Amino acid sequence: MGAAESEVETAAREVLAKVADILEPVGFQEEAELPAQILAEFVMDSRKKDKLLCSQLQVVDFLQNFLVQEGTAQDQNPLASEDTSRQKALEAKEQWKELKATYQEHVEVITNSLTEALPKVEEAQIKQAQLQEALKQLQAKKQMAMEKLRIAQKQWQLEQEKHLQNLAEASSEVRERQTGAQQELQRLYQELGTLKQQAGQEKDKLQRHQTFLQLLYTLQGKQLFNEAEAEIPQELDLPKDKLQQVTQPQEQNTQDTMGREADNPQPVGDAGLPWLPGRQQHKEES
């Protein structure tokens, strides 16, 4: 029985060693780096292996307990027959063979699964590396595009600020010119009003002088008109051409008046006064 027990322990150790060898290539870091689909398949395979290992450990535990119980029963009952012990040993050996065959089948299934999974894992790792490289290139392109966009936005902003500054300067210059033009126009209007006022005053003054000259000429005759004519440039300070225009009608009127005086001489007693037609009519009536 000791040999059988040592054989069972040796077989259990071998099973544990094989399971450890099968599970050793895959670690937590590799699991974390695998894609979700491959990782799910690997987890399912791992669960199958864990179940198989648990069932094998249960069998080993059952065999150990069985051997312990057999040893205890033999110690308590030393009179048990040797045939019964051999029969039980043969049954245990048969069970062990069945368990070993089942274990081999499961090991083959697991090995085949791993053989099929390893190429997929390698392919997934290659795809992962390609995706990482593509992601790096995409990030680099994105960074370059963002940099170009930032430079373009900054340049556009500077151009807009410069354009707005030029517009502000042009608007200020236009406003200054408009203000100056309005002030100049207002000044010209004021000067025009002043000139119109002065022209009106000069016109009134000229009319008064003309009336005064006509009255003097009518009252005192040509000699007084000549004296008044000599005083006109001093009082009016008019140009010669305007003075000639003013005096020519007066001279014509003087000649006409002298002709009428020659035709109608004044009385002797009234030599100091100018002759008036109304006065002559008054004498005739008296």
Swiss-Prot record:
Query: What is this protein's function per UniProt?
Result: Acts as a component of the outer kinetochore KNL1 complex that serves as a docking point for spindle assembly checkpoint components and mediates microtubule-kinetochore interactions. Kinetochores, consisting of a centromere-associated inner segment and a microtubule-contacting outer segment, play a crucial role in chromosome segregation by mediating the physical connection between centromeric DNA and spindle microtubules.
Superkingdom of origin? Eukaryota
Q: Please identify the protein, giving its name as recorded.
A: Outer kinetochore KNL1 complex subunit ZWINT
Alphabetical GO CC annotations of the entry are: cytosol; dendrite; kinetochore; Knl1/Spc105 complex; nuclear body
Q: Where is the composition biased (Low complexity)?
A: 244-255
Q: Which residues form a coiled coil?
A: 85-211
A single Gene Ontology biological process assigned to it is: mitotic sister chromatid segregation
Stretches the record annotates as Disordered: 230-286
Spell out the subunit comment. Answer: Component of the KNL1 complex composed of KNL1 and ZWINT. Part of the ten-subunit outer kinetochore KMN network that includes the KNL1, MIS12 and NDC80 complexes; a bioriented kinetochore contains approximately 150 copies of the network. Interacts with the MIS12 complex subunits MIS12 DSN1, and PMF1. Interacts with the NDC80 complex subunit NDC80 during mitosis. Interacts with ZW10. Interacts with CETN3.
The record's annotation in InterPro entries points to: Zwint-1 (IPR029092)
Q: Where in the cell is it found?
A: Nucleus; Chromosome, Centromere, Kinetochore
Q: Which keywords fit this entry according to its UniProt record?
A: Cell cycle, Cell division, Centromere, Chromosome, Coiled coil, Kinetochore, Mitosis, Nucleus
